[in-house]
Structure formats: C-alpha cells, structure tokens
Amino acid sequence: MLKSLLVIAIGASLGAWLRWLLGMKLNALFPTIPPGTVVANMVGGYIIGLAIAFLAASPSLSPEWRLLIITGFCGGLTTFSTFSAETVALIQEGRLLWALGSISLHVVGSLAMTAAGLLSYQMIGTR
C-alpha cells in the first residue's frame, strides 16, 4: 500500500508541475481561451491512450506502473476542475460561443487524443 501511495504521489507531482508550467508559458500568450489547460488535457489524453495500450500489452509489468503513469502523472496533468472554472468564467463574461468552443475542444479533443495514443501504440507495436 505504501509503495502504491508513493508512486501515485510522484506521478501526480510531476503531472501537476507540468500542468503548471504549461499554464504559465501558454496562458500568457492567448489569455482569451487559456491554452495551457487545453494542451495539458490533450497531452494527458494522448499519454493515457499510449499507457493503456502499452500496459495491456505488458501484463508482466508491476501494477505500480499504471498507478504512476495513469493515476498519478495523467491525473496530475489533466484537469477537469480548471477546465470547468475557465468555462464558467467565459459564460459569466457573456462569451457563450467561446465557452461552447472550449467545451467541444476539451471533450472531443481529449477523446481524439486518447484514441490517437492507442492507435500510435498499435502502429508502433506492429512493426
């Protein structure tokens, strides 16, 4: 149990640090729709897709790898709460089209990136 908690904490710390860095660097460039959150969710979706495929193909790996990568790192990197807060702020500002665009981009984009991660692993794995 302690080992599981430790790998989750390490992964979550690294993922949250990367999300913070993306927000600091990218949100200043385009504050209308904070791209740091979008990029964090897209990258996280892609990594989760890759990780799911890789871990499914590697059953001998320790279960802590799943906890480190998916639960920890991707859990710390991706952010539904920040996406929700940013979307509500857009609605409160009366920018409904921006809010709808943000919702579409996050949801469809994250799903597409997860599928792309799965497909990427399948393409690499068949070579």
UniProtKB/Swiss-Prot annotation:
<keyword id="KW-0813">Transport</keyword>
<dbReference type="InterPro" id="IPR003691">
    <property type="entry name" value="FluC"/>
</dbReference>
<keyword id="KW-0997">Cell inner membrane</keyword>
<dbReference type="GO" id="GO:0046872">
    <property type="term" value="F:metal ion binding"/>
</dbReference>
<keyword id="KW-1133">Transmembrane helix</keyword>
<dbReference type="Pfam" id="PF02537">
    <property type="entry name" value="CRCB"/>
</dbReference>
<feature type="binding site">
    <location>
        <position position="75"/>
    </location>
    <ligand>
        <name>Na(+)</name>
    </ligand>
</feature>
<keyword id="KW-0915">Sodium</keyword>
<keyword id="KW-0812">Transmembrane</keyword>
<comment type="similarity">
    <text>Belongs to the fluoride channel Fluc/FEX (TC 1.A.43) family.</text>
</comment>
<dbReference type="GO" id="GO:0062054">
    <property type="term" value="F:fluoride channel activity"/>
</dbReference>
<dbReference type="GO" id="GO:0140114">
    <property type="term" value="P:cellular detoxification of fluoride"/>
</dbReference>
<feature type="transmembrane region" description="Helical">
    <location>
        <begin position="4"/>
        <end position="24"/>
    </location>
</feature>
<keyword id="KW-0479">Metal-binding</keyword>
<comment type="function">
    <text>Fluoride-specific ion channel. Important for reducing fluoride concentration in the cell, thus reducing its toxicity.</text>
</comment>
<keyword id="KW-0472">Membrane</keyword>
<keyword id="KW-0614">Plasmid</keyword>
<feature type="transmembrane region" description="Helical">
    <location>
        <begin position="37"/>
        <end position="57"/>
    </location>
</feature>
<feature type="transmembrane region" description="Helical">
    <location>
        <begin position="96"/>
        <end position="116"/>
    </location>
</feature>
<feature type="binding site">
    <location>
        <position position="78"/>
    </location>
    <ligand>
        <name>Na(+)</name>
    </ligand>
</feature>
<protein>
    <recommendedName>
        <fullName>Fluoride-specific ion channel FluC</fullName>
    </recommendedName>
</protein>
<dbReference type="GO" id="GO:0005886">
    <property type="term" value="C:plasma membrane"/>
</dbReference>
<keyword id="KW-0406">Ion transport</keyword>
<keyword id="KW-1003">Cell membrane</keyword>
<feature type="transmembrane region" description="Helical">
    <location>
        <begin position="68"/>
        <end position="88"/>
    </location>
</feature>
<keyword id="KW-0407">Ion channel</keyword>
